């Protein structure tokens, strides 16, 4: 067998690059090369000489003796993280942050209040090489520390990814004006005391021409625009030319005000979760969808009911849900969403209705009025194919068979096929569906009933919430 030692340096480097690409996690990506440099002097020279193309990093954790060991290595960029687990001992993290001219990635999650203040104290000056920043305050903290305006020296020119969760940062819009290379922006679990108005958000986004993903999520439904101060629709829109994905969690009025001010011609994915509300009125959202080509046509929809939420998903690209527990509230809320064109249904042909089979299972009662189901189904006027799980077949078929005489096609007028996950022979569902088929046949509308085998793996991958 030929020895690897006969390989020239350029081929050896390609082997090392291949090894680098096989390491998927942050930990493995930052530590894989350290074993190579201890093999022999030649390997060490090849690795160190090619540090830029191999993207060599030094990882600093709460357990890394930074002050004792960091200078042993060449001055590679630093990755500062507590991925192995949150801790109150942040001395080594703080020591790593002192090397601000070398830090290019910070990933700190579930940081408690006192530790967070120590981190903030070391981040008031510019971090000129910083490209990735993830800060998550512990969800157990009742008093949220305020990030001062001087954070990062008010400048982040190389930052590409910014994730802030549970963070109170009034000066964020000013910082974003300097982050012109930002690709992903995640602002999640925003405290009510840290409310940012839609107008301020859009102003901050206006300079982010490279932004591809925006996640904006509020902690409470109290975070909503003041009705008295809501502005009329803007005659011009801020164009976000690179934006492809939006995640939003909040109230309907906020989303409506936000999209009234923007255009996103490349938007392919839109995922929305509303807090429970009585009315969903979003005229500007409808206009936004009409000028977003990739989201106008919806061919199939999955209506899914779960423990704490109900969701409508369209082709994995467009998802809107409502946070509430009781099934009757979920059905009623989805009907209101559909009536407000969340999502647009004029081109819909395939409708799936089922329960979520993973996660905590709900304890639903069989006391939902049939009229609630009929009101929801009434919104799907173009559906040709209806897919029903065992859990919901009995409920929905019972509601449909109440439509007799001239009302048989009042709901789902273009229906051609019903697909059932499972039906007990001779059971009530089979009898009721026979009546529905017969009644439709008399009115000149033929319906075929078939078996549906659910694709559980696809269901798991389908939803983002």
Regions found by a protein language model. Give the residues of each.
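Leucine-rich repeat
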Residues: 1-465
